[in-house]
């Protein structure tokens, strides 16, 4: 059974590792200007039915949660989380840095 306690405690799927080895020596521009990033963005646009959507990829779960929460909540709102919830135990500092309180139940 997989247990995703965070972004980095499980190994990668074998197919992903194979593909990384296959493409390892390719010379590509960084910062999201490569063909793989563009392909991923197109797949996301298609899946969402939004061909004109701006897609921004982030490198980790904490960063992603902080950006999404900060952009969705009003300044006076907070996040309600279980006491044992990942956002409370592992990400609260990142969330509260944006000015939002994590309210543990």
Locations of the language-model features?
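Conserved N-terminal alpha-helix of the aminotransferase class I/II PLP-enzyme fold
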Residues: 13-61, 83-89, 94
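PLP-dependent aminotransferase-like
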Residues: 73-105
């Amino acid at each position: 059974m997989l247990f995703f306690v965070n972004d980095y405690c499980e190994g990668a799927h074998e197919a992903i590792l194979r593909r990384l080895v296959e493409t390892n020596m390719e010379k590509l521009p960084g910062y999201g200007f490569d063909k793989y990033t563009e392909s991923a963005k197109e797949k996301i646009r298609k899946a969402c039915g939004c061909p004109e959507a701006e897609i921004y990829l982030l490198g980790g779960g904490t960063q992603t949660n902080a950006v999404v929460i900060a952009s969705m909540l009003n300044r006076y709102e907070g996040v309600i989380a279980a006491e044992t919830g990942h956002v409370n135990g592992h990400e609260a500092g990142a969330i509260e840095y944006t000015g939002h309180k994590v309210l543990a139940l």
